[in-house]
Amino acid sequence: MLVLGIESSCDETGVAVYDSESGLLSHALHSQIATHRVHGGVVPELASRDHVNYLVPLVDEVLTKAKIRKNQLDGIAYTAGPGLIGALLVGSCFAKSLAYALNIPALAIHHLEAHLLAAKMETPSLDFPFIALLVSGGHCQLIEVNNIGEYRLLGDTLDDAVGEAFDKTAKLMGIPYPGGAVLANLADQCLSTPYQFPRPMTDRPGLDFSFSGLKTHALNTWNQSAKKQGDRSEIAKAFQQAVVETLIIKCKRAIKESQSKRLVVAGGVGANKALRSALQKWINDIKGEVYFPALEYCTDNGAMVAYAGCLRMMRGESDGGLGVMVKPRWPLA
């Protein structure tokens, strides 16, 4: 089965072709960072316009790379939520229209489910069940994954998502958008820090997260410093250490409670070097398994949508009719 995947939930336009027999045939991505940098953050209207401009060229590009024609496609999967409503509508309307023209099924895909399954796309031997740590700009969740569509929410953020906390902390210290990755790089390059930040919500039971207080702590520390580059790096180091250790403490609890030793990391923050290294070391110590998507599949992309769509379409699933229903807010579990 050949499935075209379309991702347009926020500020990246992703398109890919996945084959149920051969795997991922091609994928392409357009990032809108340059479009939004001047505004200091994502502007929804501009995001939608960029998707309109790039969807057709990207579809043509991936089909050419895969050496297939549109009429060879068996289905089209598209992100239907959660995300920016305008951006979602651009992708969904395009997908439904193209599917109608080709007389093939279209299927709405949950953005977070696509992230959860990204590691399985590269490692088909990854079996259910597993615990997933979903860490991105909009989400920070621990999820028990028992099968496709069978999810149980174990823990969620009570305020900022972890990627959001990185970006906001960077902005508070004068790092331009998108600052989260820059903040992480500063932390990685800093050998040591005199600062010790709190590990929020680790002094009580439960698997929920909270990062807004950590962000405030970083701001207060920055304001009390000389505000030199060295101070910025040391604060970044302390902030990242606190985030990583907090995530690991919660993962340890989730693994212990579930009695599973299989962990999957998903979402854009899954590309963080310090987090990957710390999780790998801990999992090795307990003789467990941890799966990370390749860096290019951590952030939003069309490949994960095409893969999730292929898995569901092979079970006979598809949208009914031409109605386009996107869900800016759409709980996974």
From Swiss-Prot:
Predominant localisation class: cytoplasm
Cofactor: Fe(2+)
SUPFAM superfamilies on file: Actin-like ATPase domain (SSF53067)
Catalytic reactions on record: L-threonylcarbamoyladenylate + adenosine(37) in tRNA = N(6)-L-threonylcarbamoyladenosine(37) in tRNA + AMP + H(+)
EC number(s) from the headed UniProt entry: 2.3.1.234
Keyword Metal-binding: yes
Keyword list, A-Z: Acyltransferase, Cytoplasm, Iron, Metal-binding, Transferase, tRNA processing
One Gene Ontology term from the biological process aspect of the record: tRNA threonylcarbamoyladenosine modification
InterPro entries: ATPase_NBD, Gcp-like_dom, KAE1/TsaD, Peptidase_M22_CS, TsaD
Annotated substrate binding sites: 134-138, 167, 180, 272
CDD domains: ASKHA_NBD_TsaD_bac
GO CC entries: cytoplasm
GO terms for MF: iron ion binding; N(6)-L-threonylcarbamoyladenine synthase activity
Top class in the EC scheme: transferase
One Pfam family, short name: TsaD
Cofactor: binding comment: Binds 1 Fe(2+) ion per subunit.
Key word Metal-binding present: yes
Localization per Swiss-Prot or TrEMBL: Cytoplasm
Binding locations of Fe cation: 111, 115, 300
Entry's family note: Belongs to the KAE1 / TsaD family.
Known function: Required for the formation of a threonylcarbamoyl group on adenosine at position 37 (t(6)A37) in tRNAs that read codons beginning with adenine. Is involved in the transfer of the threonylcarbamoyl moiety of threonylcarbamoyl-AMP (TC-AMP) to the N6 group of A37, together with TsaE and TsaB. TsaD likely plays a direct catalytic role in this reaction.
Name of protein: tRNA N6-adenosine threonylcarbamoyltransferase
Organism: Legionella pneumophila (strain Lens)
Gene of this entry: tsaD
